[in-house]
Amino acid sequence: MTELHHLTVTAAQAALAAGDITAVELTEACLARINATEPTIRAFLHLTPDAALAAARAADERRQQGRSLGPLDGIPIAIKDVICTDGVPTTAGSRILAGFRPPYNATVIERLVAAGAVLVGKLNCDEFAMGSSTENSAYQITTNPWDPTRVPGGSSGGSAAAVAAGQVPATLGTDTGGSIRQPAALCGISGLKPTYGRVSRYGLIAYGSSLDQIGPMAWTVADLAVLLNVIAGHDPRDGTSAPIDTPDYTTALTGDIRGLRIGIPREYFVEGMEPGVESATRTAIEVLRDLGAILVDVSLPHTRYALPTYYIIAPAEASANLARFDGVRYGFRAEGETMWEQIEQTRGQGFGPEVRRRIMLGTYALSAGYYDAYYRRAQQVRTLIKRDFEQVFTQVDLLAAPTSPTVAFPIGQKINDPLAMYLSDVCTLPINLAGVPALVVPCGFSEGLPVGLQLIGRPFDEATLLRVGDAYQRLTEWHTQRPRLVV
């Protein structure tokens, strides 16, 4: 059998059902792997080993009694630290939330617990999910398991690195502008950004409220389908949660994609894309043709405006959302002679430079005299970007494109160049602006580092994305590759 810490969710599920392993053995293997690799990877901000082992023992007891809760019962999972967990530190990677323990669980956590998942801890991320490298965390820099001198991507870098390093078989991340998909690509795993509204945001610490979405990260598309079955669905506590039925996503994994029309958007093969990335992506697209799909060249003409549009709308929403953090009721608090001085010092010291930068950008865009020139105009362009997708989906069933223009870059290379960092999400931002779903699967290597193929779908049609991604993984072996970590 594969080493326990390298099992996929579906493989672990089968081994548990067959009695080949116990949930306690699987959890202990993951905890041992975490202890061995954390000095190098630094994916976790907080571990809950005692609670995890207690949950694993409960899962084993249920299984012995014939009361298993389903495919996630006894499976270790870790959570990005922007998702609230009752009584467990939740910092959003920020000093301003140091020591904060939420008094409730996010809806996705409630659903995972109800499904028997074993939660082992909270994962590092860029502060308030603002970043593309996980270098913006106030606590530590997570490294890429394929090359620890390089970034894992961001902002869900801890979530991607934890899977790639074999610390846990699956994680939850969040995606506001590519924060599930880009790190999944850079770490050689699979990741899904669901349609906006498919997964509840209740209990998610907000960055961009019209853009944020929680999603699963794991080795295989089959694993993602199992996780999405659990976390998706309407939640009356989230006003943006879509009141529509959720299918059984595992039934979509038929392996047959014959006749599907897949669009290849020319605008996503951007100038400056590394040749190895483009080559791996185009080779992967040809595999889809070999599987019987029909490839169609398409255009999304307003893609070139996505980057400036995003960096007006997202900071504007962040400016409003982060106004609540003042040190008065919870988290970090600085000293000051007056209330206003205390708030100013708390926010100045509690927020890192990238968060402060985006708050200032957003406040400027929303200010009197600039609202119409920037924010309102950005919303108008966002509508044009949405219409591009609506129009192209009358011609094709889904799109296939690169995820990132580069492979994982060296730690420190872009952290002092915000524009260069922002450009790393040029292939992912438009999807968030349109609110449509997107899936990333590993599709090869360039200079020894992973490359990811991005599949983009119609709103609420995650099933087709999963069907195509699963068919691709049945014919290829990129998702079976594991980094050679020296521990």
From Swiss-Prot:
Reactions performed catalytically: L-glutamyl-tRNA(Gln) + L-glutamine + ATP + H2O = L-glutaminyl-tRNA(Gln) + L-glutamate + ADP + phosphate + H(+)
Key word Protein biosynthesis present: yes
SUPFAM superfamilies, per database record: Amidase signature (AS) enzymes
Keywords carried by this UniProt record: ATP-binding, Ligase, Nucleotide-binding, Protein biosynthesis
GO molecular function per UniProt: ATP binding; glutaminyl-tRNA synthase (glutamine-hydrolyzing) activity
Pfam families noted in UniProt: Amidase (PF01425)
InterPro entries: Amidase, Amidase_CS, Amidase_dom, AS_sf, GatA
GO cellular component: glutamyl-tRNA(Gln) amidotransferase complex
GO biological process entries: translation
EC number: 6.3.5.7
Residue stretches spanning the membrane: none
Active site, renumbered: 80 (charge relay system), 155 (charge relay system), 179 (acyl-ester intermediate)
Family affiliation: Belongs to the amidase family. GatA subfamily.
Quaternary structure and partners: Heterotrimer of A, B and C subunits.
PANTHER family linked to this entry: GLUTAMYL-TRNA(GLN) AMIDOTRANSFERASE SUBUNIT A, TRANSAMIDASE
Full protein name: Glutamyl-tRNA(Gln) amidotransferase subunit A
